[in-house]
């Protein structure tokens, strides 16, 4: 009887240890996903900063905010209008993209293995002088099963639905 009791305690303890290990593994996986998404967001912030080099302002014969040479800032809505989330589409998706694989590398939006997607929200703070840029990176809650099947092509055209969805995680 004592041996059976000892074995029952051992089995219960072993099951507890396995449950803790599973919880730790899941926590580490989620932390890794958050870190990758944060790194992607930083990458997009740097791309927007790079784009500001092409922004000219003021001077003789130049409109107050000439964004025509920029790649991404050109999408800023008119001053006083509501800003919404959009997907920044680079001119050459083979060079840089709004879609990323599990490791945070740029990839084509239609490629297999797309895990993370980037979006931005641009808004005038001081019209013609200062733009606020928010960057959101999102990925499916269970990226190991099914990937981005619910929002193909990184959800281009579904930005509002993605923001309201319980099936994705995001960092801003």
PLM regions and their residue ranges:
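Aliphatic-rich helix starts adjacent to a transmembrane/signal segment
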Residues: 1-42
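Low-complexity, Gly/Pro-rich coil/beta segments used as flexible assembly/activation regions
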Residues: 35-172
């Amino acid at each position: 009887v004592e041996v059976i009791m000892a074995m029952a305690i051992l089995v219960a303890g072993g099951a507890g240890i396995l449950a803790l290990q599973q919880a730790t593994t899941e926590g580490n996986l989620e932390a890794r996903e958050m870190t990758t998404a944060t790194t992607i967001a930083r990458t997009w912030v740097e791309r927007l900063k790079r784009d500001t080099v092409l922004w000219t302002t003021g001077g003789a014969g130049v409109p107050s905010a000439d964004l025509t040479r920029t790649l991404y800032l050109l999408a800023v809505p008119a001053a006083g209008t509501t800003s919404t989330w959009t997907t920044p589409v680079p001119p050459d998706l083979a060079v840089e993209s709004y879609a990323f694989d599990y490791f945070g590398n740029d990839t084509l939006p239609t490629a297999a293995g797309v895990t993370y997607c980037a979006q931005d929200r641009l808004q005038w703070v001081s019209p013609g002088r200062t733009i606020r840029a928010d960057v959101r990176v999102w990925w499916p809650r269970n990226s190991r099963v099914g990937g981005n099947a619910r929002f193909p092509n990184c959800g281009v055209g579904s930005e509002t639905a993605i923001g309201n969805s319980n099936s994705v995680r995001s960092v801003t």
